[in-house]
Amino acid sequence: MKLLVLDGNSILNRAFYGIKLLTTKDGRYTNAIYGFMNILLKLEEDVSPDAVAVTFDLKAPTFRHKMYDGYKANRKGMPPELAEQMPVLKELLAALGYQIVTKEGYEADDIIGTLSAHIAPEDECYIATGDRDSLQLVRPNVRVLLAATKMGRPETNVYDEARILEDYGVTPKQMIDIKALMGDSSDNIPGVAGIGKKTAEDLIVRFQSIDNIYDHLDEIDIKSGVRQKLTADKDMAYLSYKLGTIDLDAPVDTNLADYVKKAPDVQEATSLLVSLEMFKILEKLHLNGVAAPTQPKQEKAEKLPVYTELTKELFEKLSASTCVNFLFESKEHVWFSDETFVLCADLQNEDEKARFLAFLQDEKIEKKVFSSKEIFAYALENGVSAQNITCDITLGAYLLNPSAKDYNLNRLIQEYCPSTVSAESELPLASDCANLRTLAKKIEVKLEGFEQLELLRTIEIPLAEVLASMERVGVLVDKEGIQQFSEMLTGRIDALQAQIYDLAGEEFNINSPKQLGVVLFEQLKLPAKKKTKTGYSTNAEVLEGLASEYEIVRDILEYRTLAKLKSTYCDGLLKVIGKDGRIHSSFNQTETRTGRISSTEPNLQNIPVRQELGREMRKFFLAGEGNLLVDADYSQIELRVLADIADDKAMIDAFNADADIHTITASQVFHMPPEMVTPLMRSRAKAVNFGIVYGIGAFSLSKDIGVTRAEADKYIKDYLHHYAGVNSYMEKVVEQAKKDGYVKTLFARRRYLPELASSNGMLRAFGERVARNMPIQGTAADIIKIAMIRVYNRLKAENMQAKLILQVHDELIVEAPEAEAEHAAKIVSEEMENACKMKVRLKSDANIGKTWYDAKG
């Protein structure tokens, strides 16, 4: 038989520190459980054990504490974020059928040692742990699997006798002798004072054991200082040997058959995993069933509609319904359901396609769907407009939990409808569609409770149609121009590379941080921060600190900028140009926690515009023949939102008087009339204005604007003194977030902040920065979405040929026939400025040009 024994505390600890904090929507921490389960499942996959035992320490003192008062005396208690996960993990393991083993007076290591020592010679034991104490237990049929979580993924290193000899030069049992000499700071095992790891290993390799060392202490060839240390701490060495020796005879059950996994309690295990929102773990476990409902207990599984063959009569009956749920599988099939039946329409059949398109346009039928954007896209492709979509399950789930990893339909059914019984079906999509009604109902109830149903129906769903249209139209690009620009960049990159090699005096891989660090800080002797295990840091912050004094560093920074511009933006754009010469980016509504729209293939939000060369990229985005581009962006929208949310009179008055807010801020911070403010002062005030929005501190501000930390601190204090409303807002929003567990925008979009309850100071500080910033950034994102909807609808209402084609941050771009361009610019500005009524007027400037570069003005 194969026995797998897990050191529960050790692996849970490794998982906790190896994965960033994760929480459920209601704020329960789950990262340690998630990591532990991934490690356990990976171990089972690798080992294929016949039996599994999971051991844990107990809080009660052990025989080692009685032997030595100082044993583990320096151990801090578990962080509360980890401690709360321990009982939940044990409950989950028990539900899954694993045997948990504990024994008062003994540690998990002793239980592991006892189980491994009592297996028969023909059996095998695999010990999974996060520390090296168990290496002493290795023998021919006992191996140690050192488990860890790196970059969120489980890893294991296998230790047998050969590996221990290779790494340490000793046998497994001699690992105890090494610990006796060097001690163990984590367990507060004293060892011999002044003897470290290297010396301890060397002594045991040479002399085999502490017994042999002390029996021949006066004769062996060692330094006199080492001999003195060994003599002085002989008692401590032997005490440490006892403390470090794992007990092989703890009073626990050693019958392997008793550790064979029991059948899981499917409902209990699934219920726990659903409540922990661990849907991927649930999928990996392949449990045959789903959880029984937990709230309310009396709830019964809903009776699902059943699949029925499509007939013309049934379709007509469906079309007569006031509310229909449907799942758009592809351009080939669409699944419908109401309370009693599920239908599938074949969109390759012209009659059924025509009925479906008529159904989409029918304003009387309320439609609840899984994903509205693909439905809007299909409608637009066929020259119609989808009407009265009142629920988009994906977008609704996103609003309820914007930090979820995905919004997969099966996962959402498990999360929101745990009482739904999903039987195996030859038509899984029929089952999925049958669940839509219940799922939509649950999500709508939650959204209504959070006052977010209007956000879904008036912003997110209408926006999905706008984005579908933008993706369909795309933006024309100058392919030849991009190719020439890329070639020019290649020439400049090659020239910089040659110059860097010349200054370095050798050729090396500039893109390798390790090689670059050696060249800069060892060969050229540039001042370096402390070297780490992975080498010298050569990130942008480090290099920018050296750039003013060293030409090679300036060249390296420019090299990186041009290489990024070429690979990501030039070559990247060339890969995604369609047959029509246009780029059809995918716009995403569920990728960011603030509500901002993101884009992929390509990511148009990240086109670099701070450097002139980056701005040149805009020249390659064109209007089609006979068309022009209209570009409009908001003026300082986040500061205007801040003024409104903070109800800061000074800032509101400045904006409504059309004053230059940065000059006004500089006037207050530097205590002088606005007319005496210099460009440098205004620039620094601008950094303060926007820095405050993003929760910047004195240290970061000082680096951004090149002043001392004390000066930066004074700028921030003077700013908050003048804008007292902003200061008050910054304090109140954090306090409210701590009470509520979330912050929200003016339109009720939420971001949950479990970090505010963390015992980790850095995480708490991060949570506080987000609490201050998200209502501002999120409200600005909501406003630009509203503006997009208004522009799109007005262009349609006025029967214009102009089309909204791009959104980049606070900027909208419309492509319009030359004859419509002026009117389109007027429409865009008006709709952007009227998107939201606040105490501060929104301001938008529109410009027209043949290229994005020209239209940007």
Briefly describe each language-model feature range.
Residues T23, A73-V252:
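Extended two-metal-dependent nuclease catalytic cores across DNA- and RNA-processing enzymes
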Residues Q99, M151-K179, E299-E302, S337-G449, ...:
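Active-site-proximal helix-loop-helix substrate-binding element of RNase H-like nuclease domains
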Residues S337, A397-A423, P428-A430, N435, ...:
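Function-dense linear segments that define catalytic or interfacial modules
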Residues R472, C570, H584-S585, Q589-T592, ...:
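Conserved catalytic core of nucleic-acid polymerases
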Residues G491-A498, D502-R554, H721-R769, N773-P775, ...:
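C-terminal polymerase-core module
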